[in-house]
């Protein structure tokens, strides 16, 4: 059970469809809170705190399935790797997407993060954009 100090108003439900196991996305820190889960199948989730403060760079990982939901606060980078084919990855957010939104990114495969992705970097399906994210040492912490 999740208890929040203040109400979280969900304004948008997003779904990302990934047809192949090994699709690897992230790590993106956004200026909104979100709940993430899957409608079907399994993903390996990874999060890195990119907020300014003592927890900057802290990493958490967990396997997610339709029975699991994770709350990701604004400023914590979110990433995932599909472990099954035909995954619908869902995320509820408390702010609408905007082209003016400020994001912070960190590289999925930065050794400093110590993320043990189940599917290797060589076998993972990664966008050029995600592969080009900076290493943690070059990330400017996000003000939230």
Cite the ranges covered by each PLM segment.
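Non-catalytic, conserved peripheral segments adjacent to functional cores
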Residues: 1-64, 84-86, 93-144
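Conserved metal-binding segment of the jelly-roll/cupin
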Residues: 63-85
